[in-house]
Every structure is written in C-alpha cells, then in structure tokens.
A protein has these predicted regions:
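Terminal targeting signals and extreme-terminal segments of soluble enzymes
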Residues: 1-88
C-alpha cells in the first residue's frame, strides 16, 4: 500500500511516518494487530484521528475489550501524535 501523506503535515513529518503508514509495520504491531495504516484517518500537527473497527477480536468478555490491548493502541496513537509535532 502506498502512502501519499496527510495534507496537514509538513513534508518532513510525512517522510518520517511514510513506512509506518504504508503498512510496513514493526513486529509488535503485527503481533498485536494494531493497524495505523488502516485506522489513522486524519493527521495534522499535534492531532491524529484513529477509527478502530472493533470487531470483537480483542474482547475478553462480551463487549469488554482487553485493557492491555487498549493501552497499547493508546500508546501508539499518542506516539504518532507526538511525531507530528517534531521539528525537522
């Protein structure tokens, strides 16, 4: 999958996240099924919007998502948000 970049981000930020957003994910993301390449819908400096399609595959009970997985997803979102604000 190719990544064209987010129009609200400076070129150096789009360059930093291009591999990640093209689906070339690190092992931890692949193992946990965290897909920023599919779920990150918008990004601008200091802001990202993720839409996670909760299909129940991360549930520990009916309608209850495993908290550790939510923590990992949240960490990923916050990290990506931080990257949008880094200087060149």
């Amino acid at each position: 999958m190719s990544f064209e970049g987010f129009p609200g981000l400076p070129p150096h930020v789009n360059a930093r996240i291009s591999t990640f957003m093209s689906g070339d994910l690190p092992p931890a993301h692949r193992n946990m099924g965290i897909r920023p390449d599919l779920w990150c819908k918008e990004a601008s400096v200091g802001r990202v919007l993720f839409r996670w399609p909760n299909d129940g595959s991360r549930d520990i009970n009916d309608g209850r998502v495993f908290g550790g997985w939510i923590a990992a997803l949240s960490d990923n979102i916050v990290s990506l948000c931080m990257v949008t604000a880094l200087e060149p």
